[in-house]
């Protein structure tokens, strides 16, 4: 990867960055087609081409986003709407036979009363179920942190990805 991509992701994991810039640096120019860009914005899901090969990408958005209701969502955290979107995307890619690439920089799932009322447990279970049933090739790239249940939800080792790569500054704790 060009040095500018390595510089995009803070080695200490403290700096926000736009996950779309990370994706743009690794996919074929003009091949980016985002899935539900205005929904579940703490995860980015997109149909892309890498080296001419069509794949689906699921990546963390590491900058703060705002929902349609005006609620702020912290970057790197999986919310109920994001988990729902990613589950549907994984199922679609599996149905069409598209390999999946996961770009992890995740602190985990959002917790708390509000998250529970929004259905984080149900939505997280949907994502885990979709991933465990996916038979397409999967590759995981840890670009920043990968912690707790977030590691599993974004194709951690338990889901048997074909390859797991980690950037030099990556941190993994389950």
Q: Model-derived features: where do they sit?
A:
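Ligand-binding clefts of soluble mixed alpha/beta catalytic domains
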Residues: 1-174
């Amino acid at each position: 990867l060009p040095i500018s991509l390595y510089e995009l992701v803070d080695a200490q994991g403290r700096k926000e960055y736009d996950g779309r810039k990370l994706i743009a640096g690794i996919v074929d120019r003009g091949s980016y087609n985002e899935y539900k860009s205005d929904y579940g914005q703490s995860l980015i899901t997109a149909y892309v081409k890498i080296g001419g090969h069509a794949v689906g990408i699921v990546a963390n958005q590491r900058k703060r986003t705002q929902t349609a209701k005006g609620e702020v969502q912290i970057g790197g955290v999986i919310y109920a709407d994001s988990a729902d979107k990613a589950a549907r995307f994984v199922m679609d890619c599996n149905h069409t036979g598209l390999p999946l690439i996961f770009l992890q920089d995740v602190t985990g799932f959002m917790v708390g009363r509000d998250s529970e009322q929004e259905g984080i447990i149900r939505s997280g279970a949907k994502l885990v179920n979709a991933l465990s049933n996916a038979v397409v090739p999967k590759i995981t790239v840890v670009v920043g942190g990968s912690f707790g249940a977030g590691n599993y939800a974004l194709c951690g080792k338990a889901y048997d990805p074909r390859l797991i790569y980690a950037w030099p500054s990556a941190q993994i704790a389950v």
